[in-house]
């Protein structure tokens, strides 16, 4: 019985309530807390709950050219509705990317509510009320300019405001505006009558007012009145004037309600209005123009109005003491502002005008300044070598100075960029010339250059190298301008780089680079290397993102129109507020506020569901998923049948509608081509097809084809680590795509034509239901595609017609033979050409078979007709065996192509589909093919120009080979000379194989072996490279598609197949359907939220995660997420025990400067870091204080480690205990890029060392061999100069004459070739090889060097042996730690050696054992000596602290001290309460006493940097001086030493525990006892006895008595001893369990967290802290948006319960054996179990173990176990037969069998050792199978090995 499958049961039986979730008690418990609190709103939230980035309703904004309140505008548009409302007729002002003011369209408006606002006040009088998350453009104190959330703003930050604003122009009577200005300033309209008075003491103004009144109002009666005791006025009686005033609402008392009419604000008449108003109410005070008004609205209007003219005004509030009223003062300051006022508005009064001119002279630049990001300016200076003025050192620049400096700087930048582009252009051309061409033109070149012909022949044969001058002459003759290239190289080296930088990259000396560039060198190959290096450096500069960003910053400074207004006050407001916002696409800002301010708008995170947006939904959902266009060709298998199709055709097959909501479709019968781990092309199953619509796509053209896809779709490319995905938008011309040529297996050699059988069958009709295909018939079908047609007479008589040229005798004969052989009836005739019917130029062969004709008609055409342009290659052909496919192509080529088979064949066609079919068919048949201009090409030969299938991208291959460089026996660079020196972008696989044969495989390290294996796979891969030629954006507006290939993420598609990256079906499932559907439904009951589980989210691909993020943004009004984190002040510990605040760590982690932390696992890799505000997740922050005084702040759901496991802060109470790791403190991580080894100084040291060894300088040496290295370099330089003019013998003679030394011809030859040896050079090179020259002070290795150095000074010895042996004597544990440190530096030490010893100490005989190691590493030996470690007896020669330690950072000083005290310091010890002391002791001879004292003084100073006090003591013992440095004896001093420095190696762990005991002891005295004492004193009032108080506080009675007497607090006798501490408090020997003495809630805070790789923990403030709850592979945007719960595998009983429930509901008989089998194969995965059950139910109602194992392709565990037991019993043949049964009858893969064998190991009755051997053997077999070995052979070999093992 077959059951028709409905909805997948995984979805049908998904848990509906928290109680339905089985086996996850901890998670359910946590989620139920949220239900109880009802505090978590709807869904997964990607922003603060219920709050957008919004403003209050009274915020002013310029919309459509007028100033209005934002609330009023949005209420009109939305009709009071909350949420999003679309609009298309609203315009606002904002700034573009250059900081210029522009007008933008608003896409939608937004209304919401919030409980919290931030109120901001600025120096210029601005006042804003915004939500906490509203971003504002800020100029920070460090000069950085960025959008900052309001809650993060600080007083002193500067807010971006516009320098001018624009209004839509409107007409207004200028004289009426002027008259109104006068009236508002000094006029009054009577409330009851038609009287108006204008009161002003200036006669000129009164006269002007009267003139304007008479002109504007015809009924006006005007009279001037001069009063004795008050100011004169103009009296007006005019009904018209009063009606005009009444309309403006200004009749009667008007002082606090005046405003600038909007019509005037938008018109040119504004100028006249302002002049009149300022004439009346404006004045000059000190250095400013000031105007006072009682109307706040008028004051704010004036600021906006003045900005129309670029005048920046300040608004200031003042309370009038006489009437206690608030007045608003408009203040215009700064000479540039005042001058703008004068030029655009001015005064009419002479008196005010004169004062204005006077104050304009006084410049005050401090009012209009910007804080400069000096780092960006300096970066430009350093990168482009630009000279800057001293102003760069100033933090603040005035606006005018800023524009002037940056505009000048831009000119210099542009000049240098142009010069660099010219240099780049010159360096693009290689220096090397074609010596074959030189050979051909030798005679001509000799004549033109004057170089002897025989000399040129020597150059050609390589017997002599030409000098640069001669080389240039030859190159010029060949038309190659080498001189231009050399000049460019010299300019770049001197101007933009340095000889040192270039030399370092090429591993050459600075002087060598100078010689090659400046001299007449013969080393042309070296010049070519320099050219390539310089070209790389030029490109790095021109493509430097940081430089581009910095130049953009300068461009912004030079062109912006922003005034930076300093914030002076920030206040949080609580209550219920309605908030509003506008959405401006692309620029996301607009100008608004009480005074004009640049504000940010909402982003797509505040969009509602698609139905609200209608046709505009895609504006915010453009890149929902990365996809390819609908007509992209792809080869697929559907139900096992191969089909060359397009995504558009797949859409028709799988999608039911054209509805955009139907975005994905799960499939189980679809396969695509992809690549496996060995880079072999394979079929893989598709789980999901995805589609969505986009407006635009990219078209990328490459060699032989093109692909169309969205910009965020990734294409697979090759880099040095293998295959990587790169976004299409990041692809550049010249990049290499990957295609394939492979032999894909095919099985068919027969066609089933039964469906085409004629209805009326007679004896004359040949029936061919089973049509066998051999090579002949395959060729015949291929020929049909080229030359065939089909015809029918009526419905039954069909013919297959071949038309061939009458001259094509071979084809005609071959076709006739095949037709005859197959027994077909045929008919032949001649036919005319299309131009001349009479000329019978072609012959037709007609196969008379209706069945064959119907088959051809149905399969060889696209369904749109039977013309040539409709032809296709039938899908069945793609399934034929490989040899048959090749013959089909041969037939196609013979009929319609040019060229030669097995060389290059061109096949022309009018059918694009046919050409694409041909290319795909050829490629799966092992033939390279491409498409060019209406033809398909099949390619076997023709060099790189034609044949590409043997080529791979050169750059990653070269990088891989360089990693093996030291293990290659031969000149691999010569093999790849074209790629290295001529810029060839690809390399052949044959050359890779050739180089691999030269590799010494046995000497490869593990990492090198990985590279070698990768290269080996690539040398055999079926992939090859195609170069990108062109990229363009095209309009599209249609569906795009993607497929999900589980566990592979790749597929081939395109008209020429290209390897693409795919999506992930789980992410799509969550994104497209569940989130959308879930978000649209309301919560049931009174619970205000729902929860989504994002299970196994670490399996999501980056594409799927990005799509999830976008969907979350889309529904962000109903989303929330859960995280648990620490506040930013928490200090986390790095592996080398430096501290760093967690917020700083995350910044450095993002910059990839720090990647590891210390946790329970030791050193662990950080995979993710996140920051957010704890209010987002509704978790308040708590402060925990421990008995040691340690503190930490964390969210309530953050976990800390306790004796009983992890516990949330919510669960922890006072007196509970948490575990602490006593990490060192006091040394923070700081970036310090100084090098610890100065190579120049080291070289100088080596030179002096050479002299000690007997080498001599020039003047003293008799031969070249005796010379010091430095003088050998001088000889080299001179030899290179002479090499162009003289023979080797002549050079030798001249060198001997000039330098007075003997030198051999062999040495001369080596020097000419640039080869130089020397002691100093050898060890400098060794230092470089080990990478020690790159070590900086902030590198962990700097600490290792310092630690070792300290220990070696104490207990090490540099012997006087030639090989440079170092001896270190210590305990075995110490030596093991030292060896680990040495290994990290690349130094190998001997095994640990133990010896018996006997010696006398202080007159006593001592016997025992000593242990030591020795190190034979001359480079390390010399480096130690260079750093001051004496060779021989240190006690005689004395001790030194190296300069790099002395002047280093605290990190290297601490490590040096740890090493020194670890060697010679006393181990701290406590008995009961008291420590025995810490000191450093060294016995020295009298001769080195003073030097040792100096050394100890320096150590003492170093200790003082850690606030550790010490003193020095010297005493005589046995004629030696015991010099001791003693740490002062007090607990606080000891604690500082033990917690900040401690010891290296063995003494360290115990010392930390001593330190933690002291910390608890001191905290008890300083914190706990102090509090007890204060409380006891308060209560000691006679009511309670002293004994009662002592019992209450658990202290002795005498402690209370001492407090009453005022004595110092002592430690009570009942305080734990150190022995008790070790027993009761120490856990696992390294953690301390400490009591929480205080827990307090401190509200919401910004919090941080990190995710580690190996262990979910990290050390923070000493606490062992749990890391993020979400998985390690989630991208940061998801981490910051998503609630992720980690589900553990379910228990058997949990799965069984659920399966029984489902079986009962579905009417299935689930047997016990069937249940056990499902549990076994599902491995704790409920979804897998349900899927197996549903699959089994499709075959039978009775589900037993047999059917379960059959549908899951798994063997019974007892079968596998039996096979293993047979093998172990030595019954190999029986075991092998059972293996074959599993593989053949059960259809199991080798990998599945191995997995089951691995699971059965524990159940075998064999000893532990054999189990280990067996696990190792299974692992080895698995590796070999993965590498491509035959499964059956490998598994048989494994059974054979087990048979031998069993003996």
Curated annotation (Swiss-Prot):
This protein undergoes a protein self splicing that involves a post-translational excision of the intervening region (intein) followed by peptide ligation. Gene3D superfamilies: 1.10.8.60, 1.20.272.10, Hedgehog/Intein (Hint) domain (2.170.16.10), Homing endonucleases (3.10.28.10), lambda repressor-like DNA-binding domains (1.10.260.40), P-loop containing nucleotide triphosphate hydrolases (3.40.50.300). One of its GO terms (molecular function) is ATP binding. One of its GO terms (cellular component) is DNA replication factor C complex. It comes from the Archaea. Keywords: ATP-binding, Autocatalytic cleavage, DNA replication, Nucleotide-binding, Protein splicing, Repeat. The keyword Nucleotide-binding applies. Residues 179-311, 780-927, 1348-1508 form the DOD-type homing endonuclease domain. Belongs to the activator 1 small subunits family. RfcS subfamily. PANTHER family: REPLICATION FACTOR C / DNA POLYMERASE III GAMMA-TAU SUBUNIT, REPLICATION FACTOR C SUBUNIT 4. Heteromultimer composed of small subunits (RfcS) and large subunits (RfcL). The intein interrupts the potential ATP-binding site. This is Replication factor C small subunit. It comes from Methanocaldococcus jannaschii (strain ATCC 43067 / DSM 2661 / JAL-1 / JCM 10045 / NBRC 100440) (Methanococcus jannaschii). The gene is rfcS.
